[in-house]
Amino acid sequence: MKDRTQELRSAKDSDDEEEVVHVDRDHFMDEFFEQVEEIRGCIEKLSEDVEQVKKQHSAILAAPNPDEKTKQELEDLTTDIKKTANKVRSKLKAIEQSIEQEEGLNRSSADLRIRKTQHSTLSRKFVEVMTEYNATQSKYRDRCKDRIQRQLEITGRTTTNEELEDMLESGKLAIFTDDIKMDSQMTKQALNEIETRHNEIIKLETSIRELHDMFVDMAMLVESQGEMIDRIEYNVEHSVDYVERAVSDTKKAVKYQSKARRKKIMIIICCVVLGVVLASSIGGTLGL
């Protein structure tokens, strides 16, 4: 009799290896989904911080000379947003590189498709929040610039929008303020507010520059993924349509089948009745 011990042992080792690979893959996906939840939490925090920034902007604009506490709170929020945004960007980059490595090895699996979809979704959400933040900063800059222009008018100095932009870009506020006579309290207050708003714009532009490269990088990433996302959404929508049509067709088939069954029963009943009538007629004739 042939000894199959070695063959059975090899088969067992192969099964053990497959089980280890399966367990490792499950563990990897568990870690991936933990990352996804962490990134999602960071994006939600960014969104909340952006809303808080809007409130601080309104508070600062409402006061000619905002208190230091409010300005410090805004600076802290700006720092937190920058820190969280860089963290999200770093984690999304790591996931992207991992996906590219597997694609380079021509690997294709359900897990890889899940990771690509999650990465695309998170990237879009991240860019949406950062776009809102960028729009919030730009709006605040415009409102600060309007305040400067109004205060300059109070001092008797009229400027065009282009002149004001040149001044803000150069950072030379003294071009407009040096020759203003401090002949009234109103003029002094106007100059103080001009200086305050100018300082706010300087801080804003520094923040915008710091986040600019990251914003462009992530926006380009999402744009490159756009076609893939559109294809996924198209397939999902058409899958839903197909399922709905299939359900509708099934209902119609059941309905038609039910009608056919009822017709069949009615025909059988008619045949039985007809048979009874014929039998009775024949019996009566023979009796005669």
Swiss-Prot record:
GO cellular component entries: axon; nuclear membrane; presynaptic active zone membrane; synaptic vesicle membrane; synaptobrevin 2-SNAP-25-syntaxin-1a complex
CDD domains: SNARE_syntaxin1, SynN
Quaternary data: Interacts with OTOF. Interacts with SYT6 and SYT8; the interaction is Ca(2+)-dependent.
Organism whose genome encodes this protein: Ovis aries
Function, as annotated: Potentially involved in docking of synaptic vesicles at presynaptic active zones. May mediate Ca(2+)-regulation of exocytosis acrosomal reaction in sperm.
SMART domains noted in UniProt: SynN, t_SNARE
Record PTM Phosphoserine, positions in chain: S10, S14
GO molecular function terms attached to this record: calcium channel inhibitor activity; chloride channel inhibitor activity; identical protein binding; kinase binding; SNAP receptor activity; SNARE binding
Name used for this protein in its record: Syntaxin-1B
Superkingdom as given in the UniProt entry: Eukaryota
Lineage of the species this protein comes from: Eukaryota, Metazoa, Chordata, Craniata, Vertebrata
SUPFAM superfamilies listed in its UniProt record: t-snare proteins
Composition bias, Basic and acidic residues: 1-13
TM helices/strands, residue ranges: 265-288
Ranges in the topological domain labelled Cytoplasmic: 1-264
Pfam families assigned to the protein according to its UniProt record, in alphabetical order: SNARE, Syntaxin
Entry similarity comment: Belongs to the syntaxin family.
InterPro entries membership: SNARE, Syntaxin, Syntaxin/epimorphin_CS, Syntaxin_N, T_SNARE_dom
BP-aspect Gene Ontology terms: calcium-ion regulated exocytosis; exocytic insertion of neurotransmitter receptor to postsynaptic membrane; insulin secretion; intracellular protein transport; positive regulation of excitatory postsynaptic potential; positive regulation of neurotransmitter secretion; protein sumoylation; regulation of synaptic vesicle priming
Coiled-coil parts of chain: 29-104
Region named Disordered: 1-20
Predominant location: membrane
Gene3D superfamilies: 1.20.5.110, 1.20.58.70
Gene it is expressed from: STX1B
Keyword Membrane appears in the UniProt entry: yes
Localization terms from the record: Membrane
Location of the t-SNARE coiled-coil homology domain: 191-253
Keywords, ordered alphabetically: Coiled coil, Membrane, Neurotransmitter transport, Phosphoprotein, Transmembrane, Transmembrane helix, Transport
Lipid bilayer topology: Single-pass type IV membrane protein
